[in-house]
C-alpha cells in the first residue's frame, strides 16, 4: 500500500489519475492523506503488504485511538458510484467542495472516474468561501450536475443569494456528515435547491442510504438494541487495524454504532435516531441528542445547536444544550427552550442547562464535536 499526499486544492490534478489506475487494477492500494498528517502513514502501515483487491484505505471519523482504516475494494467503490448515479438520474459532472481525503470527497472523485468526467474543485482548506460557488458551478458546464456538502456548508451558502441561486441550478446537492437541521432543509427547499439527505460512512464507501431509502444493492437491518446493520456490495472488507469487537464479524454485514428504525420492516425507510455512544442516561431514561437538536432547531432564535450529557449527582447525567443564536435575535432563556422542546418530546429530553456560544466546535468534514463541548463545559461546572 502506498500513500498519496494531497495538498490543498490539488485533488483533481493528483488524486484523480491515481484513482483511475487503482480502480483499473494497475496500481497498488492507495491511502490519501493531507500533507500535515505524517503520523497516519505509520498508523496505517503504509508500505506493508495488503490484500490485492483493496483499492483504497480510508480513515474513519472516530475521535479516539489509532485510525482503523476502512479497506475498500474497487468493486465496492464502483458499486457505490454506479448505485448513486442510478438513484440521482444518471452520471454527471461533480463539484468537489469537501476534503478529498475524507470518504465524502473520495466518493465524489470515484463517481467522476466512473462517469468519465473531471470534477471542478473548490479549495476548502482555509474554509468554505460561498462567493466562489457561482463561478465553480458555472464551470461544470451542461448536462447533469451535482455536489456533496455538509449541513454547515449548506447553511452558510443560504446566507448568500448568489450562492443559493447557483446551488438551485444543480440536479442534486447531497448532504452528509450528520443530520441537517430542519430549518436549513426547509430554507433550501424554498430556494429551489434539490437536497438529498445521505447516510453512510467510510465503511460503506460513503453514502449508501438516500433520503432514508437504501441504494440498489444495499441491505439494512435493525439489530436487537436498535443498532443499524448495513450489508451489500458497497461494504469495506474490514479494517486495516482490526478492533474488538469486530463490527464486520457477521459475514456480509457491518454493525454500525448508530441507532435507527426501519418503517415497515427491513425493506422500509430508515430513520437514523443517533449514535449509541452519545446517548444520555438521565434519571433512568435514555435521551438521544439528535431528536432534541431537531426540536431546538425549530425555535426561531436558534441558528445552530448541539446537545450532550454532563455528569449529575442526582440524575446520573443531565441534558445540556449549546446554541448559536440567530442574527438579530435575543438569546432565548432555558425555560423557553425547555417549553419548546416539551411540545414535541417528553419533558425528560428538555435541556436542564443552556450555554450560548458563538460557534460550535466541529471535526472531520463538519460533524459537531460533542466531546469538545463536554470537556469545555464539564470544566466550567467543576470550577
From Swiss-Prot:
Keywords, ordered alphabetically: ATP-binding, Ligase, Menaquinone biosynthesis, Nucleotide-binding
Keyword Metal-binding: no
Pathway linked to the protein: Quinol/quinone metabolism; 1,4-dihydroxy-2-naphthoate biosynthesis; 1,4-dihydroxy-2-naphthoate from chorismate: step 5/7; Quinol/quinone metabolism; menaquinone biosynthesis
PROSITE patterns assigned to the protein according to its UniProt record, in alphabetical order: AMP_BINDING (PS00455)
Record field: catalytic activity: 2-succinylbenzoate + ATP + CoA = 2-succinylbenzoyl-CoA + AMP + diphosphate
GO biological process, one term: menaquinone biosynthetic process
Function: Converts 2-succinylbenzoate (OSB) to 2-succinylbenzoyl-CoA (OSB-CoA). May be involved in the biosynthesis of menaquinone.
Name of the protein in question: Probable 2-succinylbenzoate--CoA ligase
